[in-house]
From Swiss-Prot:
Chain sites annotated for binding Ca(2+): E197, D211, D252
Subunit record text: Heterodimer with NRP1. Binds PLXNB1. (Microbial infection) Interacts with human cytomegalovirus proteins gL, UL128, UL130 and UL131A.
Name of the coding gene: NRP2
Protein name: Neuropilin-2
Function: High affinity receptor for semaphorins 3C, 3F, VEGF-165 and VEGF-145 isoforms of VEGF, and the PLGF-2 isoform of PGF.
Organism: Homo sapiens (Human)
Lineage, broadest ranks: Eukaryota, Metazoa, Chordata, Craniata, Vertebrata
Broad class of the protein's primary localization: membrane
Length: 931
């Protein structure tokens, strides 16, 4: 009885199965024209798809230049298991051999897919096992909107709006708006309304997935990206001086919003002839917007945010979540900017009235926000001394301007906790006369206008040599070529007045080994031409030879190198020395239209001076790349401070030397009554210290920028005059922290002629300064003059001691007349080089000149222990010399040596000076008596 119903069940299943098999499956696959939008679904969608499916579709566009876009329904369900059994596959073409765009399964719908050509191949496969709901997608022609919404703007002002504004913008837009400004014009962009699709999962600024607006400093995808914006937060005002500002607007297939409306203005920009690169960049004034300020973390109560870190802000400051030297405060300046000083301030809590401040910090800079350089002091990171209380403003001035976009402050030590407010000081590159960027960064110079002697691979071709905007750069075919053999050339399109270049290192490598190289050029030469055939080098006015420019010390940090205006359409840069990783370069050319240039004397360097002066050096990994193979040539590449070489010709030229203008008088050669043996133009100047017998005497110092030579000495040359007898003295001293050393001194009348002085600047682990001290005694009449101080690269060190009488021996007594009137000297030096901070209440710390304690004679710095050591050493040398003389006498007397057997070393008298032997030829005499 029980078997009968069971038999009927099996029979029913059998016949039903045969009935299903007898019905043919609905067809799937085929060729589809995307002229009219349509849908593709898995068989049976949204019900479970059948087993053993193998469907193929080819979707094509009616025109060969059209693309196809696919958008999937969120209800997506295909068996998982790593897409081995059931899957949908999309290929960029018309066959199974085309490039794979995606292979998908699971229950997460694929993102939007866009073809690169006019066809897409779609395949759906299922096996015999578990099934799901399948998929549904919409195909259509991809419309960029370029024909409807892309536009160039050249009028003095105008409005830029999203398509259809104030109605909701369309889907699938990819619009480009470009504002083009004439030379000497600044572009100001202000947003009035901004409403784009918001990403609820957005993590930080610029993290936009659906609809967004990109703003570019130049041509899109060529110039640097200023920012990516979405949601409802209105972008702050933008000011661009590169001549091109672009906006690209992207929308997807989903949500549409009201869009945006913005106005732009073109404002005439006339650079000042005698500008100072020390203006506040906008932290205190608000010109730097809140969106440009960020931090590694923020205190949890939300009352100490990065946006509260503005100098003199009355609402707390920035505090990280944890007090650690790994925390940082970051400012995005949006454009390349010259940074010359940083002012910091602590904060007092409004809730507890407790004071917090940073006592020291490190500085990091970057041009792209990813590759960072720590500001260094020699080989070590520079630690800036900051505040001593919560309200004082401390200003730290950089020795040389840093060209950067992103700035990070990393607190190192603090009181009670980290609290920081700050202001940044500097200027724009284009603030200097005839200093427009001529198109490498912005893209105004096309790829076809950039060429090179050779190229390593297409990834590092000349077109990749654009300043900042390229992440790689130009690499020649041979990374370690001969000096001057490789070159990078820029065609400016029309003749321009060229006044400088900005040079930057590069990132690249060997595609076979996949090892990234961080390369830069240490020294280079520049040539120019009007026709591309006849070339001339930029000349060094002192030697009338091709000028050897200092290059980079880090692969990411750019450096500006200026020269006298030249007419040129073609500019070439020849690498002469480079980093151990080889030659790598990015470039920009500075200048203006040929008719705009005027003969001016200017420099981009700031007039600020401080003890916070450091020359950037390579990072630790770069410094150790060559290991033990580092040669003496690499040591010579250490860059001296800007402004060390100085001829005092122009009042507008702020050489790095500090001096008392009331005592050192700048005098022209034509007006000088002093005799000289050379003829110079009327505008040549020199420094003169003068006194007559009726005066109380004169004492003046001329102080160099800080110098750091940890590995090799260099030769310093200068010209001098000293007249007036024994009451006149001129000496050169090396001054370091807690130490002074006399290097050179003359104290007798040198006659009326100009003479050459040469001194070896010794290698030294610490930073030091070179000080010229001129003294004219009380009741004495005389004159001291100095001119043309420079570092010589063509004088061998063994010839760098002139005159030889100026080099003191160990027991040399310096007869310097005593001077009592030094009051106010330090303040007078500071006034000449101080920044005008009259508009703020900043209290600067430090001084631009050494303290008066260091002005004392170097003899006073010797303590009794050191004197004892010197005395004992001298006694040992004397005993050794006596023994050596007795031994030589015995050898010559009893071995029958003739005078010809004596070594030739006895024909010379060697004198050690800072580790180098100076050789003076003596009269030939017999060393031994003849029997």
């Amino acid at each position: 009885m029980d078997m009968f119903p069971l038999t009927w069940v099996f029979l029913a299943l059998y016949f039903s199965r045969h009935q299903v098999r007898g019905q043919p499956d609905p067809p799937c696959g085929g060729r589809l024209n995307s002229k009219d939008a349509g849908y593709i679904t898995s068989p049976g969608y949204p019900q479970d798809y059948p087993s053993h499916q193998n469907c193929e579709w080819i979707v094509y566009a009616p025109e060969p230049n059209q693309k196809i876009v696919l958008n999937f329904n969120p209800h997506f369900e295909i068996e998982k298991h790593d897409c081995k059994y059931d899957f949908i596959e999309i290929r960029d073409g018309d066959s199974e051999s085309a490039d794979l765009l995606g292979k998908h399964c699971g229950n997460i719908a694929p993102p939007t897919i866009i073809s690169s050509g006019s066809m897409l191949y779609i395949k759906f496969t299922s096996d015999y096992a578990r099934q799901g709901a399948g998929f549904s997608l919409r195909y259509e022609i991809f419309k960029t909107g370029s024909e409807d919404c892309s536009k160039n703007f050249t009028s003095p002002n105008g409005t830029i709006e999203s398509p259809g504004f104030p109605e909701k913008y369309p889907h699938n837009l990819d619009c480009t708006f470009t504002i083009l400004a004439k030379p000497k014009m600044e572009i100001i962009l202000q947003f009035l309304i901004f409403d784009l699709e918001h990403d609820p999962l957005q993590v930080g600024e610029g993290d936009c997935k659906y609809d967004w607006l990109d703003i570019w400093d130049g041509i899109p995808h060529v110039g640097p990206l200023i920012g990516k914006y979405c949601g409802t937060k209105t972008p702050s005002e933008l000011r661009s001086s590169t001549g091109i500002l672009s906006l690209t607007f992207h929308t997807d297939m989903a949500v549409a919003k009201d869009g945006f409306s913005a106005r732009y203005y073109l404002v005439h920009q006339e650079p000042l002839e005698n500008f100072q690169c020390n203006v506040p960049l906008g932290m205190e004034s608000g010109r730097i917007a809140n969106e440009q300020i960020s931090a590694s973390s923020t205190y949890s109560d939300g009352r100490w945010t990065p946006q509260q870190s503005r100098l003199h802000g009355d609402d707390n400051g920035w505090t990280p979540n944890l007090d650690s030297n790994k925390e940082y405060l970051q400012v995005d300046l949006r454009f390349l900017t010259m940074l010359t000083a940083i002012a910091t301030q602590g904060a007092i809590s409004r809730e507890t009235q407790n004071g917090y401040y940073v006592k020291s910090y490190k500085l990091e800079v970057s041009t792209n926000g990813e590759d960072w350089m720590v500001y260094r002091h020699g080989k070590n990171h520079k630690v800036f001394q900051a505040n001593n209380d919560a309200t004082e403003v401390v200003l730290n001035k950089l020795h040389a301007p840093l060209l950067t976009r992103f700035v990070r402050i990393r607190p190192q030590t603090w009181h009670s906790g980290i609290a920081l407010r700050l202001e940044l000081f500097g200027c724009r590159v284009t603030d200097a006369p005839c200093s427009n960027m001529l198109g490498m960064l912005s893209g105004l110079i096309a790829d076809s206008q950039i060429s090179a002697s050779s190229t390593q691979e297409y990834l590092w071709s000349p077109s990749a040599a654009r300043l900042v905007s390229s992440r790689s750069g130009w690499f020649p075919r041979i990374p370690q070529a001969q000096p001057g053999e490789e070159w990078l050339q820029v065609d400016l399109g029309t003749p321009k007045t060229v006044k400088g270049v900005i040079i930057q290192g590069a990132r690249g490598g060997d595609s076979i080994t996949a090892v990234e190289a961080r390369a830069f050029v240490r020294k280079f030469k520049v040539s120019y031409s009007l026709n591309g055939k006849d070339w001339e080098y930029i000349q060094d006015p002192r030697t009338q030879q091709p000028k050897l420019f200092e290059g980079n010390m880090h692969y990411d940090t750019p450096d500006i190198r200026r020269f006298d205006p030249i007419p040129a359409q073609y500019v070439r840069v020849y690498p002469e020395r480079w980093s151990p990783a080889g030659i790598g370069m990015r470039l920009e050319v500075l200048g203006c239209d040929w008719t705009d240039s005027k003969p001016t004397v200017e420099t981009l360097g700031p007039t600020v001076k401080s003890e916070e002066t450091t020359t950037p050096y390579p990072t630790e990994e770069e410094a150790t790349e060559c290991g033990e193979n580092c040669s003496f040539e690499d040591d010579k590449d250490l860059q001296l401070p800007s402004g060390f070489n100085c001829n005092f010709d122009f009042l507008e030229e702020p050489c790095g030397w500090m001096y008392d203008h009331a005592k050192w008088l700048r005098t022209t050669w034509a007006s000088s009554s002093s005799p000289n043996d050379r003829t110079f133009p009327d505008d040549r100047n020199f420094l003169r210290l003068q006194s007559d017998s009726q005066r109380e005497g004169q004492y003046a110092r001329l102080i160099s920028p800080p110098v750091h030579l940890p590995r090799s000495p260099v030769c310093m040359e200068f010209q001098y005059q000293a007249t007036g007898g024994r009451g006149v003295a001129l000496q050169v001293v090396r001054e370091a922290s807690q130490e002074s050393k006399l290097l050179w001194v003359i104290r007798e009348d040198q006659g009326g002629e100009w003479k050459h002085g040469r001194i070896i600047l010794p290698s030294y682990d610490m930073e030091y300064q070179i000080v010229f001290e001129g003294v004219i005694g009380k009741g004495r009449s005389g004159e001291i003059a100095i001119d043309d101080i420079r570092i010589s690269t063509d004088v061998p060190l063994e010839n760098c001691m002139e005159p030889i009488s100026a080099f003191a021996g160990e027991n040399f007594k310096v007869d310097i007349p005593e001077i009592h009137e030094r009051e106010g000297y330090e303040d007078e030096i500071d006034d000449e080089y101080e920044v005008d901070w009259s508009n703020s209440s900043s209290a600067t710390s430090g001084s631009g000149a050494p303290s008066t304690d260091k002005e004392k004679s170097w003899l006073y710095t010797l303590d009794p222990i050191l004197i004892t050591i010197i005395a004992m050493s001298s006694l040992g040398v004397l005993l050794g010399a006596t023994c050596a003389g007795l031994l030589l006498y015995c050898t010559c007397s009893y071995s029958g040596l003739s005078s010809r057997s004596c070594t030739t070393l006895e024909n010379y008298n060697f004198e050690l000076y800072d580790g180098l032997k100076h050789k003076v030829k003596m009269n030939h005499q017999k060393c031994c008596s003849e029997a």
